[in-house]
Structure formats: C-alpha cells, structure tokens
Design a protein with these regions (language model features):
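Fungal secretory targeting signals
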Residues: 1-19
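Short, well-ordered coil/turn elements that cap or connect secondary structure elements
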Residues: 13-16, 48-50, 141, 178
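Serine-esterase "nucleophile elbow" of acetyl-processing enzymes
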Residues: 16-59, 73-85, 103-108
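Short histidine/acidic/glycine/proline-rich micro-motifs that form metal-
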Residues: 29-30, 60-62, 153-156
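Short, solvent-exposed loop/turn segments at secondary-structure boundaries
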Residues: 33-36, 66-67, 158-163
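N-terminal post-signal-peptidase region of extra-cytosolic proteins
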Residues: 62-74
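Alpha-helical cap/lid subdomain in secreted, periplasmic
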Residues: 74-215, 219, 226-238
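Charge-patterned, long linear interaction tracts outside catalytic cores
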Residues: 225-258
Length: 258
C-alpha cells in the first residue's frame, strides 16, 4: 500500500511537471551572462511559475531570421505535446527586407517581396503576420499551445508620456485573435509600469540604450508579464494556473482597462 501511494504521488509530480514553457523572442527577453550589465525578462520567468522555462530567445532576431537561422526548428525539436510556447517578437522585424536580412514586411497580410540577401541568396520575404501564423501552426502541429505576447516597450518618451502604441504589438494581437490563440498584452503592462516611474527613474533601467534593460529592469518586465497573464481581458490564460505564490504576490502594475 505504501509503495502504491509513493508510486502514485511520484506519477502525479511527473505529470504536473511534464509540460514546460519555451520562449521565442529577441534580446529584450534573452538570457545574458552573469557579468553583463544587461538582462532579458525571460531570465526570471521561471521564478514566478511552477513550470520549467526554456528561454530560447536570441539577440537580434526577428520572426524571419529566427526561422531562417534554424533557431525555430531547434525550438520545435525541443517542444513536446502539452508544452506552452511563448512568442514575443517585433523589435527586429521593422526595416526594409531589401537591405536587411532580418526585416519583414509590415502588416499581417499575404504580401511578399523577393529580395537578394547579403549572402547573395534569393529569398521570398513575407509579412510579420505571415511568420507569426507559421509559428502558430508549427506549435499546434506539435500538440503544444502557442501564446502570442506583445513586445515590451522601448524607453521612448514625449515629455512625461511614455510611448504606448507599438505597431508590431498591435499586429501580433490581430494575428492572435484571427488565429484563435491566446494573446498576452505584455506591452500594455510594461508601458504602465515604466510610465508610473516617470522618465528619469525609467531611464535608470536602460543603461546602454532605450531598448535593453539591466537586471532590475528585466525583473520588472517579467513581473509585468505575470500581471498581464493574471489580468488577461478575454478569458483566463493557460499560464494562470501555473503562477506560483511568488508570482501571485506581484501587485504592480495594477489591472489595466481592457
């Protein structure tokens, strides 16, 4: 009897921990070395969840380059049934595909442009939305759950107002809605938190430029992601059940209007 109880309990633990979270993103999310002044918000996510987090975000990548460089295939090879894949992209998708190997076409349509890359190869480049839809489809094909997340804001101020509208975040939201998958409005909660600090204090979290945070700033962006999950407007996030007591203790930024 004792053996049966121990076996059953162990089985429950394995079952509960079987699913994991994988992250596809860029330098705002990626892990940095211990001696680096910068850090990405994905580094801290496991501190607030009861799931293992595999942060596969890579510096400088867009949806297009993440796929083209084989990083997406590597992520998929590590993705199992019932896993959760968070996709937060957009910072590096902006630009002209004719001159940048990472830029995508703006928007979410089916437009394409044929370009010659810096390696001399011919490539058909799609819209940001097209690449997101591909990622969504690939994750679903693995029996896993894709979650689209709005990108964290840059530290751009006009007087005392932090920029809150980011076209690629809006595009990501539109793709998620049209695809019937979950969207986490990380952008809104990141903006709300840094707006509450004002421009001078907010700048202290961006030591090198207006995009990349230090370690404290990264933790704040993780906490704003957790708040966005907890306060999701349209239904309950699949991640909600996995927020641990540390995550549940986060109170700022407060719930934002839907």
């Amino acid at each position: 009897m004792h053996f049966f109880k121990l076996f059953s309990a162990a089985s429950l633990v394995v079952s509960a921990k079987a699913a994991k979270v994988l992250i596809c993103s860029d330098s705002t999310t990626a892990n940095y070395a211990s001696g680096d002044p910068l850090q990405g918000w994905g580094f801290y996510l496991e501190d607030y969840l009861s799931l293992t987090v595999s942060n596969l975000a890579r510096n400088g990548r867009s949806t297009r380059s993440f796929i083209n460089e084989g990083l997406w295939s590597a992520l998929l090879s590590s993705t199992a049934k019932d896993d959760i894949v968070i996709i937060e992209m957009g910072h590096n998708d902006d630009g002209d595909p004719k001159t940048s190997d990472r830029a995508t076409l703006a928007g979410i349509g089916e437009e394409t442009v044929t370009v010659t890359t810096t390696t001399g190869a011919t490539e058909v480049v799609h819209t940001f939305g097209w690449y997101l839809r591909k990622m969504i489809g690939d994750v679903k094909a693995k029996g896993a759950t894709p979650i689209i997340s709005g990108m964290v804001n840059r530290n751009y101020w006009t007087g005392s107002t932090l920029q809150s509208k980011w076209p690629f975040a809006d595009a990501a939201k539109s793709v998620a809605k049209a695809s019937g998958v979950e969207f986490i409005d990380h952008t809104k909660y990141s903006v709300a938190l840094f707006q509450s600090f004002g421009p001078d204090k907010a700048k202290s979290y961006f030591p090198k430029d207006n995009t990349h945070t230090n370690w404290d700033g990264a933790k704040l962006n993780t906490q704003s992601f957790i708040q966005a999950v907890k306060n999701k407007c349209d239904g309950t996030s699949k991640l909600r059940a996995y927020i641990n007591p540390t995550g549940n203790a986060i109170k700022t930024p407060p719930k934002q209007s839907c």
